[in-house]
């Protein structure tokens, strides 16, 4: 997923839209033309800390994007990992730019980190340092809080990115994970790159099939997904009916066997009457 992640989210307009979605409700405060790739020693050293994409903004701000893969895990230590990365990044910057010490009144570039969680399961790990560490009574005022800038695409929250490609990607994941297509989206056309990246993340074969059938341009997706969700729901209903019938038959047999036992019939006699094994009767009586 790493290659596709960098390919899709690394595009300047897509990259800034993630930050605009979280910070400015999709308003184009951050501009893609002010971004530049950061290829310095800093990136070489901190990329091992699992930062997927690092870019510099015009004013020197570092914008960093963590992408948490759907098939991997929810990392309980994510808060600590982000803190570690930012600390390493700041110290690297200081060493690169100041020989002995930092001059008085110097201000370092801001490091803004966003964690984009694209998994299906609920994010149940800490979102704040206070949720990860034990804070003893009386120490609350001395504790330095730290929180994740976390975007979760499997929740009911609808993020506005202000950019079609990332908005389409966000909404596709919500549809797949919630197994629901809104009526107003049935004829909506989705960005083809967003469609493919959604497939890479979810491994949904229907998305891949739709992608392969389309050659270029935007793609209609929702009617096929809606049919897939409906078929899945119907299969679940049929399975439930089948299980209910089987349980009903088993319960009826149990009641018959129990009534005969109450009337003094032995298990051996009951087995002979119904042409079943004694073991099957005993198992049913124990199970139910």
Q: What is each PLM-predicted segment?
A:
Residues 1-288:
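Elongated, amphipathic alpha-helical interaction scaffolds
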């Amino acid at each position: 997923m790493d290659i596709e992640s960098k390919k899709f989210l690394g595009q300047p307009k897509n990259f800034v839209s993630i930050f605009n979605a979280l910070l400015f409700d999709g308003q184009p405060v951050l501009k893609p033309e002010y971004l530049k790739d950061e290829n310095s020693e800093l990136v070489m050293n901190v990329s091992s800390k699992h930062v997927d994409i690092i870019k510099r903004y015009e004013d020197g701000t570092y914008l960093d994007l963590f992408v948490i893969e759907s098939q991997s895990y929810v990392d309980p230590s994510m808060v600590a990992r982000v803190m570690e990365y930012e600390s390493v990044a700041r110290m690297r910057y200081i060493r690169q730019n100041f020989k002995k010490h930092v001059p008085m009144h110097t201000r370092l570039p801001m490091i803004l980190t966003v964690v984009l969680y694209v998994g299906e399961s609920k994010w149940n790990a800490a979102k704040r340092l206070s949720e990860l560490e034990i804070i003893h009574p009386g120490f609350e005022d001395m504790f330095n809080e730290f929180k994740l800038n976390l975007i979760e695409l499997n929740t009911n929250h609808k993020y506005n990115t202000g950019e079609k490609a990332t908005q389409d990607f966000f909404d596709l994941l919500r549809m797949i994970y919630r197994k629901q297509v809104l009526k107003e989206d049935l004829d909506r056309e989705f960005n083809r790159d967003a469609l493919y990246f959604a497939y890479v993340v979810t491994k949904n074969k229907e998305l891949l099939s739709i992608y392969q059938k389309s050659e270029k341009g935007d793609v209609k997706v929702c009617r096929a997904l809606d049919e897939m969700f409906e078929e899945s729901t119907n299969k679940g209903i049929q399975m439930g009916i089948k299980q209910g019938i089987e349980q009903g038959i088993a319960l009826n047999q149990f009641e018959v066997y129990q009534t005969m036992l109450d009337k003094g019939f032995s298990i051996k006699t009951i087995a002979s009457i119904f042409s079943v094994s004694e073991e099957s009767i005993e198992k049913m009586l124990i199970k139910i």
